[in-house]
């Protein structure tokens, strides 16, 4: 949550999306080559991040069976002019590759092609410009997620509706509709404002959690006040409700990758990127991480595969049931998590692309 909060401070009126699992995985790879105070900082930070995941699920492998695509791309690129220790290379295996940073354009194309392959073409370009020829090591993290809704939205119900970017700025979106579904929902009033939380399940073990402020511009107060502890507390208050859900189709694709170096430095990882960096378990030369790039892509729509295109007739006793209507028509926060509570993605959507 802390990396996300740092990012949204820098991108106040922009869509933001990161994958904490992917970032943590890459930091864990770096930790294999770290020593001294660098290893201490990395180990402490990784431990703190793992405290916010279930005890039995602190490995970086995420299991989302048969129902979703989770394509991740994590890699460390090291200069071919440096001799890296065999013990380090053995630990990280396929996550490391040597390149000639003097051939800047060739290296750029190599990295972009690898990312494109690893994400099944969903992320076509991570690097928009060549890396510096002085680069000695670069960390790259990319991820793409796609899943089928447990309760698919009917395409014929999708309609054009208003989306309030702010109280004074309105645009149009394709609004998806899903009615009479039993979903996990709660409305909460905090000192900083009221908001609704709704848990929308995918087939299998994952779900999307939406935090929708009551006020059109209330997302800023949620951003300032949300913590991992508060999020867990709020999710513990969810209960099953009959919901009519109105949710915009949306797509978030980064035009430029995030360079997380300054953010990670602000969060205490100062001995990774600067003069005091100690990666002596990686190689004998004095090197430091110069870039920590992260990019993401997400596509939220009505789609489902043929395997889930099943028609069923269910008969029940008729009764008058109060249904809660949830209109997601202004900026909101969202998380995609597995059934253990591990957050795979966290994002803010405030500006239709």
Curated annotation (Swiss-Prot):
UniProt xrefs under SUPFAM superfamilies: Serpins (SSF56574)
Principal cellular location given in the protein's record: host cell
Any single GO CC term annotated in Swiss-Prot or TrEMBL for this entry: extracellular space
Classification via CDD domains: serpinN_SPI-1_SPI-2
A Pfam family: Serpin
Site (Reactive bond): 318-319
Gene3D superfamilies attached to this UniProt entry: Alpha-1-antitrypsin, domain 1, Antithrombin, subunit I, domain 2
SMART domains: SERPIN
GO molecular-function terms, A-Z: serine-type endopeptidase inhibitor activity
Subcellular location: Host cytoplasm
Function of the protein: Plays a role in mediating viral host range. May act to inhibit a caspase independent form of apoptosis to allow efficient virus replication in infected cells.
UniProt family annotation: Belongs to the serpin family. Poxviruses subfamily.
Protein name: Serine proteinase inhibitor 1
Phylogenetic classification of the source organism: Viruses, Varidnaviria, Bamfordvirae, Nucleocytoviricota, Pokkesviricetes
